[in-house]
Amino acid sequence: MGATLLIMAAGMGSRYGGNKQVDGLGPNGEILMEYSIYDAIRAGFDKVVFVIKPGMKETLASICGDRIAKKVKVDYAFQDFSSVPSFYHIPEERTKPFGTVHAVLVARDYIDQPFAVINADDYYGVSAFSTIYEKLQTLAPEGEATMVGYQLQNTVSKNGTVSRGVCHAVNGNLDKVVETLKIKLCENGEIRDIGAGEPGELLDPLAPVSMNFWGFTPWIFGKLEEYLATFLKGLAPDAIKAECLLPVFVDELMHEGELTVPMLTTDAVWFGVTYKEDKPFVQAELRKLHESGVYPASLHE
């Protein structure tokens, strides 16, 4: 049995200051998601679905989509307001789509097998893809999902605060996800949640966090649809930036007793570009991976 890789690439990248999904960061101009796709294919994934903004397809196809389509099946799903339930009136001031729950849901018509979900602008590491691929092969058809957890200390930025789903596990299963929106790496090395102001709550640097690397079966789409509808019905008219987030959805489904989530651990290194200032570090790390033989000289060959 194969598996599909769903890549969420429709985010605006407001903190980064540009469209980071298609910013060339590798030594040959490779974009970050090309590394994830390369790792996924060698792990066994046989299909890629890009979730993108309308208007991005031609650019993404020319950068990497057409080349990848020679190796695995490729589809494009659009995250825009046309997929929002008809009962919801979209405020004129709203420009952003409705978050990661919405992003996964718009890919529904393109997925009929177990699938992994990732962000386009994160580097997840080679072993993480083989680990989740193996787990996807044994997921129960209904009521079970999985996720790859990363150490909090390996996912913060020196250049500003980050948002992370801080996880707690019991007997290997995810028990709680706390979506923490303003995590700061302090000058003294401490990591704090400053969402309610500084100095903020001290966080465990070894705590596992969600980087939106999830594994699901198609059963989840019905639950996503119900959850998004409930979210929109409860949304205030002036909440023009509110997002429906995947970690919060998973947390609620777990506590309703509808979902069990075995948490996978990995020694893979994560890095990403939340801010433009993160770019030189990411470029240097990718260069090292090529030079050490983790990747060939070019992913474009």
What would you call each of these model-derived segments?
Residues V22, V166-V170, M263:
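A structural signal for short hydrophobic beta-strand segments in well-ordered beta-sheet cores
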Residues A3-G17:
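A phosphate-binding catalytic loop at a beta-strand-loop-alpha-helix junction
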Residues V126-W214, P218:
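Conserved core of the sugar-phosphate nucleotidyltransferase
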